[in-house]
């Protein structure tokens, strides 16, 4: 059997903390956190004793918490100064999110998202003022991104551009998210769940292959997979972009080599499930989004997330993981195998005890 598991929240704790901010020349930490805080759907409130409380996506709350604690930037006050006029919400295809805010009589588009995707849409970088993004500077950003990812950090890039007026009609990514100025990289740690490494060892002991599937950078995914012993010597990692160029027949032949799938979209999950099934394996697949529903349906065991899962994902799944924890799937397999074994034993016992009566009945 094979368990294809999401990384964030299932293999990790989904409690992100900003631990590193990189910018060109190291002088634009505050600007990077400002963009990450404004281009953000987190709700910031305060308890009676004045302590801050955040509600929202853990990646986004990490930005708001870091900006508040380390730089004194309160999201609520910032939004009064620069209210959000409109937005292009995040989606897993673009891997970007953009918001537009008034600034100095013009408007500023603030963008955050996957660094490799974001960098490709930038034409300048914030250094000593705005500088053209040369190949040398782009390489600096790529190297900093790789260095953070190798430390198992989830990395997001921040960029902006100024426009004279908000575009009329429907906002498009081509119009808003191009010709940007790159500001910096923000690295966050999302520690693995304590119990997962033991659960992975139990998987291997039971003849089950754990596979990690994530939207994160390949180096980040591999670093965490190695820590959990999912990625072993001889294993390979592949990105969604590489999968796009790989025919399904080839994936079916090569699927056993891959322990980590990075920058993967929900459509890729379906292909991975079918490839494993072609190899004669029983496949369990986890998912939480609306787009995960087809893969959950196709998998032999679709596991929807009980905490972060959408109603659509839960409806398409065979089982709901109430605590979103990988170790719980392994315990469920253990319990299921125990029940199956007990049923077999009961049937053997009844047949062996009553064989005389059965023969008499048929004679």
Q: Which ranges hold each PLM region?
A:
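Conserved cytosolic headpiece of P-type ATPases
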Residues: 1-363
């Amino acid at each position: 059997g094979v368990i294809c598991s999401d990384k964030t929240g299932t293999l990790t704790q989904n409690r992100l903390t900003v631990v590193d901010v990189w910018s060109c020349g190291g002088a634009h930490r505050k600007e990077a956190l400002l963009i990450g805080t404004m281009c953000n759907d987190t709700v910031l409130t305060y308890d009676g004793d004045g302590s801050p409380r955040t509600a929202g996506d853990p990646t986004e709350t990490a930005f708001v918490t870091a900006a508040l604690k380390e730089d004194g930037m309160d999201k609520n006050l910032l939004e009064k100064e620069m209210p959000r006029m409109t937005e292009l919400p995040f989606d897993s295809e673009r891997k970007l999110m953009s918001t537009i805010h008034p600034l100095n009589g013009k408007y500023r588009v603030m963008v955050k998202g996957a660094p490799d995707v974001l960098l490709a849409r930038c034409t300048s970088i914030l250094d000593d003022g705005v500088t053209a993004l040369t190949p040398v500077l782009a390489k600096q950003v790529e190297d900093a991104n790789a260095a953070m990812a190798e430390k198992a950090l989830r990395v997001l890039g921040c960029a902006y551009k100024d426009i004279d007026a908000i575009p009329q009609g429907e906002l498009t990514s081509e119009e808003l998210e191009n010709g940007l100025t790159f500001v910096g990289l923000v690295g966050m740690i999302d520690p693995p769940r304590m119990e997962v490494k033991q659960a992975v060892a139990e998987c291997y002991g039971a003849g089950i292959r754990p596979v990690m599937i994530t939207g994160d950078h390949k180096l980040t995914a591999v670093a965490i997979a190695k820590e959990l012993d999912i990625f072993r010597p001889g294993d390979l990692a592949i990105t969604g972009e590489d999968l796009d160029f790989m025919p399904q027949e080839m994936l079916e032949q090569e699927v056993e080599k891959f322990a980590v799938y990075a920058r993967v979209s929900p459509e890729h999950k379906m292909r991975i499930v079918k490839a494993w099934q072609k190899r004669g394996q029983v496949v369990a697949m986890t998912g939480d989004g609306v787009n995960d529903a087809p893969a959950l349906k196709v998998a032999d065991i679709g596991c929807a997330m009980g905490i972060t899962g959408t109603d659509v994902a839960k409806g398409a799944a065979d089982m709901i993981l109430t605590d979103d924890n990988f170790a719980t799937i392994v315990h469920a397999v253990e319990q299921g195998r125990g029940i199956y074994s007990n049923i077999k034993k009961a049937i053997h016992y009844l047949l062996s005890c009553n064989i005389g009566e059965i023969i008499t009945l048929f004679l």
